[in-house]
A protein has these predicted regions:
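Tryptophan-paired
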Residues: 1-29, 96-207
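Short, low-hydrophobicity acidic/polar segments
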Residues: 1-83, 87-93
Length: 221
């Protein structure tokens, strides 16, 4: 919760509010350019910041009458975007393949897992067609899209040997949109070791879509 005091002449108003993350102690834009409420746009097209929870943002509006006495208005903030996350279910197969040249292949899975440096691998997400890049506060809809977009992500190992490959926040037109997304995995030498065909991912405003599959060992046809 946050309160802001402003002075405006008496009258009827619509107050529109945008909220996102910036550097501590700064009021300068970081992830979004917010100078124009008809097109709040991602700040960096060349180095898209995916797999970053600081990309989360909220918007809201309220109509209010301002009179001569003290007035208060409460704005209900909601996300203008949805989130997707890719989780791979084939970690054991991936680990077995990664250590196939080891002399002792009969080690317990936990020991094999410890022998692999997952920082030696990275994931690339590619948007096959387009990616919404800006949002119109007045229409409550995305304003524009970019093509040929991608971002790089690191893998994280979770419970039950599930591997989070990456995630992103996407502006949503209305309640739901669908994007075509491809995923690729590379080793430290830049060699592609797995890839997928385009996957149609439904993205719902203010919700997270989880996509599960064998992304560590698949190869696009």
């Amino acid at each position: 919760n946050n309160s802001v005091q402003i002075e405006v002449p008496q009258g009827e108003y619509t107050f529109r509010v945008w909220c996102d993350y910036v550097e501590e102690g700064s009021d300068s834009d970081k992830y979004y350019n917010t100078s124009d409420f008809s097109e709040i746009i991602l700040a960096d097209r060349e180095n898209h910041s995916g797999s970053n929870d600081f990309r989360d943002a909220f918007r809201g509006s309220v109509k209010a009458t301002v009179s001569a006495i003290k007035n208060e208005a409460t704005v209900q903030m909601r996300r203008p975007m949805g989130k997707f996350k890719f989780i791979s279910t084939d970690l054991e197969v991936f680990v077995a393949d990664a250590v196939r040249k080891m002399s002792d292949k009969n080690q317990a899975f936990d020991k094999l897992l410890q022998s692999i440096n997952f920082n030696d691998y990275y994931v690339v997400f590619r948007y096959a067609a387009f990616m919404p890049c800006s949002f119109n506060m007045f229409t409550d809809k995305p304003a524009d899209s970019w093509t040929n977009m991608s971002f790089r992500s690191m893998m994280t190992i979770g419970g039950e040997n599930l591997t989070t490959m990456g995630f992103d926040y996407i502006f949503v037109n209305g309640k739901e949109t669908t994007l075509s997304i491809m995923l690729e995995v590379y080793d430290k030498d830049g060699e592609k070791i797995s890839s997928t065909n385009p996957i149609n991912v439904p993205i719902v405003r203010s919700k997270m879509t989880v996509v599960k599959g064998k992304f560590l060992t698949s190869m696009a046809s």
